Amino acid sequence: MTVVHFLRHGEVFNPEKILYGRMPGFKLSARGLEMAERIAQWGSDRPIAQIYASPLERAQQTATPIAQKKNLPITTDVRLIEAANIFEGKTFEVGSGVLFRPQSWKYIWNPWRPSWGEPYSELVDRMTEIAKFAASNNVGKESLCVSHQLPIW
């Protein structure tokens, strides 16, 4: 049976609680590294033939332990990258976050039709593409795609 697993990267060290999106330099926390090790344990006895990961560091870090355990390369694929977002680098919370900045309201008035970044339809298209690609290149086997919350959601 052909199986494509989608996995969100582990917990990220983000003490300022900003929306980091595609920003560089956001690495896994100690807990996130532990999560990546647990995935490696889970996958050690699975017939995973290929590992794909977003180019962002946190996804690469999450994929590394299982790739090492399985002796597989990590294939970086931009289709797995986090959604583009104009709020990168800002806090998005109650209080001092984006929600209390009137200049931001034009972007968030309709959460079902985002105007703050990459349209959902484009996310669906690229994630569907990578799923089909992974399945067709690993027929009868399993593959693992390490991505981010919004693209998987």
Locate predicted features:
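Active-site-proximal alpha-helix that buttresses catalytic centers in soluble enzyme cores
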Residues: 2, 7-76
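Cofactor-binding loop segments of dinucleotide-utilizing enzymes, especially the Rossmann-like FAD-
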Residues: 9, 79, 148
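Short, active-site-adjacent cap segments at secondary-structure transitions
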Residues: 13, 58-60, 83-84, 151-153
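A general structural signal for well-ordered alpha-helical segments in protein cores
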Residues: 36, 63, 101-102, 152
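Generic structural signal for well-ordered alpha-helical scaffold segments
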Residues: 37-44, 124, 128-136
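Short beta-strand scaffold positions
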Residues: 53-54, 125, 146-147
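Active-site-adjacent alpha-helix immediately C-terminal to a catalytic or transition-state-stabilizing loop
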Residues: 60, 128-153
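Phosphate-handling substructures
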Residues: 68-129
